[in-house]
Amino acid sequence: MFSMNSEYILSKKSEDISPFYVMEVLESAQVMEAEGRHIIHLEVGEPDFPTAPHICEAAYDAIVRGSTKYTHSQGFFPLREAIVNSYYQKFGIDLSPNQVIITSGTSPGLLLVFMALLEKWDEVIMSNPYYSCYPNFVKYLGGVPVYVYTNETNGFALEPETVKQYLSPNTKAILINSPSNPGGYVMSPENLKGLAAIADERGIPIISDEIYQGLIYSGEEHTILEYTNNTFVVNGFSKLYAMTGWRLGYIICPSECVRVIQKIHQNFFICANAFVQEAGISALKGSQEYVTDMIHVYNARRQYMLKRLLGMGLDVRKEPTGAFYVLADARKYSNDSLELSRSILNDVGVAVTPGIDFGNGAEGYLRFSYSNSIENIKEGMDRLEAFFGKNLKDNYSIY
């Protein structure tokens, strides 16, 4: 008989999942706020803007109409059609709505792609630094992340000639993210073309995380779909449309892979939320003025934050032109980014993300998010300047 005092026997692979260090920072900040301290949050990677009113109204209208049932496991056809039309308008790419699978956010989309592709010991090539969840997805499914240490002056992007050195008989996919988290960098067309050539020559698909697509402030933006069909694109509405809590994403994949991913989706998730899909249609088909206004505000914040960080002695060797992050080198102060972020939080009440959250390739770095008001960013920069200025004056490394 089961005893309430028995210990649960948990799987080793679940215990091996690494934590989000940023959550430790956030939770510590929340405790401090509960005690009455004013904390400036520069660690959170989500828009501070509300979702546009016309998107909210579409969801409300859908609920009133009774759009609260299961949908097709691939998602509403009008939403899939709107997605492929969006890619055509932006990039001139002809896609079929039947290549699209709607998911409850981008993370389930990534998980579904990895579940469809990976066998035990299969390798996935990815850059280091990387988004924290990537290795956990791969390892949990029995795969092996293969890390390519990348160069900040190239925006920490995978370079084709370097990637070739990491190919093996076990390579199952190459994973890219542009615009990127944590760096806020946009991959060049040359890099995308080179990686696409590898995919086509070797028969190795590229998994492209494009969740920050559209959040770009300088230069041209491209998608891997311009250069190869041998790709699984994962995208969503969270960042560009300020819809993080709505949980709406999608996969664009080769036609021959749709049925496999659809079956997995049916078993694990069934379908995405019906009225949220209706909101997604409104987001894509409605006015984009709200998005344009957000991008202008983000850009002003980006320029201000970058200038202030450089002025206080942090190094940013390539200008970030996408997403809403600045990844700054703080190694003149400390090689331990987690302890440094704790000190900043405790001493001056600013929450920032330690670089170690994104792999040892970002250790000694700090990630700053400008998805906060300009007033809060200014206050945060003033506090950081006081923190780093004191340590410059004392002329010593904190750790």
Please name every model-derived segment.
Residues 40-48, 61-80:
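A glycine-/small-polar-enriched, mobile loop at the entrance of the PLP active site in fold-type I
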Residues 1-10, 15-20, 25-28, 32-38, ...:
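PLP-dependent class I/II
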Residues 70-103:
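Conserved N-terminal alpha-helix of the aminotransferase class I/II PLP-enzyme fold
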